A protein has these predicted regions:
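Polybasic, glycine- and aromatic-enriched phosphate-binding surface used to engage nucleic acids
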Residues: 1-103, 107, 170-174
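Non-catalytic DNA-recognition/assembly elements of restriction-modification systems
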Residues: 84-175
Length: 175
């Protein structure tokens, strides 16, 4: 008998580290192909789209993660059950908004390719994050915020309060 079920996706997928430094502004998420073997230190999202990558890589999702994720020492512990499954995604974004998120998400991926000798840990170190990558993320954040019907948030607490309001609305629909 197997000790654990086989989790290897059969198609392209997103990798999200289970544990990520508390110092990072963005959890480093990446696309992977089925030939890359999944270990137990990551969460996977099979068949994820560029839109999915964009929303999950945004400050909106990272703020949610920082507020509800568990901790391993002081680092964030990303959980599918708590963080991902309870995240309030943009409700009914327009095709134009989806396209803007996809374009901005692609710009994040393109910015990363400018540094082929750098690991994701290097790229997302807050002390050495390349300005071009940070700018791409900021553009993505604007596109994701727009899909939520917002143009800006003054603080992370304001952003999290907004997300919890959406979450409460989702819970109310279940009752």
């Amino acid at each position: 008998s197997l000790f654990q079920k086989i989790r290897q996706p059969k198609s392209n997928y997103l990798i999200i580290p289970r544990v990520s430094s508390e110092n990072r502004q963005y959890v480093p998420i990446k696309f992977a192909t089925p030939d890359l073997i999944v270990g137990d230190a990551v969460q996977t999202i099979p068949d994820a789209s560029l839109y999915d990558f964009g929303v999950l890589t945004s400050t909106m999702h990272n703020s949610w993660m920082r507020s509800i994720a568990g901790r391993l020492k002081s680092d964030y512990r990303y959980s599918a059950g708590i963080v991902y499954n309870n995240f309030p995604w943009p409700e009914n974004p327009s095709e134009k908004q989806k396209a803007a998120i996809e374009a901005a998400a692609q710009a994040v991926l393109d910015a990363r390719t400018q540094f082929p000798d750098s690991t994701l840990a290097d790229l997302y170190d807050p002390l050495t994050m390349p300005p071009v990558l940070l700018k791409a993320h900021q553009t993505l954040d604007k596109a994701v915020d727009a899909a939520y019907g917002k143009t800006s948030f003054k603080t992370e607490a304001e952003r999290v309060a907004f997300l919890f309001g959406l979450y409460q609305g989702l819970l109310a629909k279940l009752h």
